[in-house]
């Protein structure tokens, strides 16, 4: 059984071992030890689901770090939670956050934070001062913190594209850069605060013939989209997309950022050509 999971801003396509509507078992929650393929895919799925037209408030993109690494992930967790509480007192409506690693083995925090009209006029400066006060034991410099406005939907998508494009093998998420004393327990690597306007995903099931044809069209779409961007890196990446040995190709799925209307157009085209969906 092949399954397409369609989000507002993209999709995943793969092989599904469960019948449509079947309840899927979940494993026991274990200690988090850095980024995994599962946490990366869940973060991407959430970002793809957001209805950006309904985002309200004054938005800021934050990049916050420290010079000295906290001794344990529990110490870092206390800092992050205390920082969240301070932002709530400043009028925080919602926030998405991601933890990544610097090459020197120190964590830094990326956030997209939305505030209501009660937020102070000099909000960026207040946020940087609050952060530096909280992490004074770890020697944070105000010059190393960045707080920038997200002024429109384009700014939001710039934030999303940066933090959703990085996979588990990116150096800022690599286990090689996890502090030695954090190796067995890092705590959660991403999360969200407050109410987010999301569009629920749709699941569409299909047979092998439809799956393979959809995958071919996606490959061509990705190459055309890369050429339109003019990015040499994206063009090279698109040329190698889905190039695997035949045995792996039989089950290889796909995951793409794609406007919802373009995906629907592809599905309608397949339907008109006689391809079936279950």
Swiss-Prot record:
Disulfide bonds: none
InterPro entries reported in the protein's UniProt record: ORF2/G2P_dom
Gene Ontology BP, a term: DNA replication
Record keywords, A-Z: DNA replication, DNA-binding, Endonuclease, Hydrolase, Ligase, Nuclease
Protein name: Replication-associated protein G2P
Organism: Pseudomonas phage Pf3
Domain of life: Viruses
GO molecular function, one term: endonuclease activity
Enzyme Commission (EC) number: 3.1.21.-, 6.5.1.1
Stated role: Isoform G2P plays an essential role in viral DNA replication. Binds the origin of replication and cleaves the dsDNA replicative form I (RFI) and becomes covalently bound to it via phosphotyrosine bond, generating the dsDNA replicative form II (RFII). In turn, viral DNA replication initiates at the 3'-OH of the cleavage site. After one round of rolling circle synthesis, protein G2P is linked to the newly synthesized ssDNA and joins the ends of the displaced strand to generate a circular single-stranded molecule ready to be packed into a virion.
Catalytic activities: ATP + (deoxyribonucleotide)n-3'-hydroxyl + 5'-phospho-(deoxyribonucleotide)m = (deoxyribonucleotide)n+m + AMP + diphosphate
Similarity annotation: Belongs to the inovirus G2P protein family.
């Amino acid at each position: 059984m092949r399954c397409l999971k369609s989000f507002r801003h993209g999709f995943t396509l793969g092989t599904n071992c469960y019948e449509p509507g079947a309840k899927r078992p979940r494993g026991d929650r274990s200690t988090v030890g850095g980024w995994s393929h599962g946490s990366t895919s869940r973060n991407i799925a959430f970002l793809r689901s957001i209805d950006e037209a309904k985002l309200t408030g004054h938005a800021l993109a934050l990049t916050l770090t420290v010079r000295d690494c906290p001794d344990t992930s529990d110490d870092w967790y206390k800092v992050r939670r205390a920082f969240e509480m301070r932002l709530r007192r400043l009028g925080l409506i919602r926030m998405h956050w991601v933890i990544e690693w610097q090459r020197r083995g120190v964590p830094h925090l990326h956030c997209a934070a939305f505030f209501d009209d009660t937020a102070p006029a000099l909000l960026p400066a207040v946020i940087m001062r609050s952060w530096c006060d909280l992490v004074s034991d770890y020697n944070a410099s105000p010059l190393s913190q960045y707080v920038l406005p997200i002024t429109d939907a384009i700014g939001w998508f710039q934030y999303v594209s940066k933090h959703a494009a990085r996979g588990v093998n990116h150096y800022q998420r690599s286990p090689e850069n996890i502090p030695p004393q954090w190796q067995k327990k890092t705590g959660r690597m991403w999360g969200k605060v407050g109410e987010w306007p999301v569009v629920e995903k749709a699941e569409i099931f299909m047979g092998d013939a439809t799956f393979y044809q959809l995958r071919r069209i996606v490959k061509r779409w990705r190459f055309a989209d890369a050429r339109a961007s003019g990015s040499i890196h994206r063009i090279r990446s698109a040329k190698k997309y889905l190039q695997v040995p035949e045995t792996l190709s039989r089950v290889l799925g796909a995951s793409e950022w794609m406007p919802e209307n373009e995906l629907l157009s592809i599905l309608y085209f397949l339907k008109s050509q006689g391809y079936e969906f279950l």
